[in-house]
């Protein structure tokens, strides 16, 4: 795109679409933060806690304790719902970021692609940790942390742009 071509940015959109973008972002931040609170509550965001969540800590644990080994059906359900749901979250936040006037297009492309790659790494690590080696819990914690940081950066940049 040359510098003479018009750019589609939040500033060029009607107020109604800016309001929609603002509220979608706010609700996503609340929802994502709530999900992180749940993860903290169930795993303490540690590799040992994550391992216990998926591999189980006690073979006799009840489902109410949520620290039992996840079955193949549970792993498939968890992966299916979370992967598709999180992809939608990052489509929306990526669209919002694409409409921002800053950062540069190169950085925007990197920030838009990053969560999709990290989602695949996170869910691969979850499966590898569950069925192959518990040490993959470190990769799951690291990739999920990067995913959260990227989400909050997307949200900050979009809300900053919409506050102008």
Describe every region a protein language model picked out.
Residues 2-67, 72-74, 96-99, 110-118, ...:
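Polytopic transmembrane helical bundles with strong interfacial aromatic enrichment
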Residues 83-101:
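Transmembrane alpha-helical segments in integral membrane proteins
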Residues 103-107:
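Membrane-helix interface segments
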Residues 128-140:
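Extracellular/periplasmic helix-loop-helix junctions in multi-pass membrane proteins
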């Amino acid at each position: 795109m040359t510098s003479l071509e018009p750019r589609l940015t939040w500033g060029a959109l009607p107020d109604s679409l800016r309001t929609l973008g603002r509220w979608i972002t706010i609700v996503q931040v609340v929802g994502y933060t709530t999900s992180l609170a749940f993860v903290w509550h169930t795993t303490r965001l540690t590799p040992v806690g994550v391992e216990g969540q998926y591999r189980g800590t006690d073979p006799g644990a009840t489902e109410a304790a949520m620290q039992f080994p996840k079955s193949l059906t549970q792993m498939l359900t968890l992966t299916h719902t979370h992967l598709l749901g999180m992809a939608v979250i990052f489509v929306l936040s990526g669209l919002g970021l694409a409409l921002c006037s800053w950062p540069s297009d190169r950085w925007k492309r990197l920030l838009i692609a990053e969560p999709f790659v990290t989602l695949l790494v996170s869910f691969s690590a979850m499966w590898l940790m569950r069925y192959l080696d518990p040490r993959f819990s470190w990769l799951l914690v690291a990739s999920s942390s990067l995913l959260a940081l990227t989400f909050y950066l997307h949200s900050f940049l979009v809300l900053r742009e919409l506050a102008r």
